[in-house]
Amino acid sequence: MRERQNSYEYEDLLACGRGELFGPGNAQLPLPPMLMFDRIVEITETGGEFGKGVIRAELDVKPDLWFFGCHFKGDPVMPGCLGLDALWQMVGFFLGWTGGSGRGRALGLGDLKFSGQVLPHVMRVQYHIDMKRIMRSRLVLGVADGWLSTDGEIIYRATDLKVGLFQQDAAAQAGK
């Protein structure tokens, strides 16, 4: 397990995807192409709307990103589910970063609103998570609100994003 930082570059995120950041069997990010951000620019255990922690990440948008070629031909747009998954990825990363053990699984959300699209001409996507609750018992559960913006304009808002960290056998059950 590496020393905890307050920001992470792309190579650090890849190390997390390989299971090298938080130790074997613990929270991992997906590897490309499903890793949906290029860097974490801020992560803290305090602050944010609820005083429970903040995580901010960014994705540099390039017209040749894999999803633009297939979603949709002649009308390229990033699938909304990928932006949502990025928010879940960040909550899981936060849980591992704070010492939670187990494998991360998205468990749902309260509400989701889209008011714009991520298109190839966008320069940067910014993601923001405000942690609301962290419960540590047989399972580690994080609940957060988050948003996604393109070039500074918020276009997705999600409430009560839920991610759990499960031990290996329980993670297999959660995925059923």
From Swiss-Prot:
The protein's UniProt keywords, in alphabetical order, are: Cytoplasm, Fatty acid biosynthesis, Fatty acid metabolism, Isomerase, Lipid biosynthesis, Lipid metabolism, Lyase
> What is the annotated localization of this protein?
Cytoplasm
Species of provenance: Afipia carboxidovorans (strain ATCC 49405 / DSM 1227 / KCTC 32145 / OM5) (Oligotropha carboxidovorans)
Query: Which purpose does this protein serve, as stated in its record?
Result: Necessary for the introduction of cis unsaturation into fatty acids. Catalyzes the dehydration of (3R)-3-hydroxydecanoyl-ACP to E-(2)-decenoyl-ACP and then its isomerization to Z-(3)-decenoyl-ACP. Can catalyze the dehydratase reaction for beta-hydroxyacyl-ACPs with saturated chain lengths up to 16:0, being most active on intermediate chain length.
Q: Which InterPro entries match?
A: FabA, FabA_FabZ, HotDog_dom_sf
Complex and partners = Homodimer.
- One biological process GO term for this chain? unsaturated fatty acid biosynthetic process
Q: Which Pfam families match?
A: FabA
- Gene name, please? fabA
Q: Identify a single GO molecular function assigned to this protein.
A: trans-2-decenoyl-acyl-carrier-protein isomerase activity
Which is a Gene Ontology cellular component entry for this protein?
A: cytoplasm
Q: This protein is called what?
A: 3-hydroxydecanoyl-[acyl-carrier-protein] dehydratase
* CDD domains attached to this UniProt entry: FabA
Matches recorded under HAMAP family: FabA
EC number annotated for this UniProt entry: 4.2.1.59, 5.3.3.14
**Pathway assigned in UniProt:** Lipid metabolism; fatty acid biosynthesis
Give me the reactions it catalyses.
a (3R)-hydroxyacyl-[ACP] = a (2E)-enoyl-[ACP] + H2O; (3R)-hydroxydecanoyl-[ACP] = (2E)-decenoyl-[ACP] + H2O; (2E)-decenoyl-[ACP] = (3Z)-decenoyl-[ACP]
Residues forming the catalytic site: H71
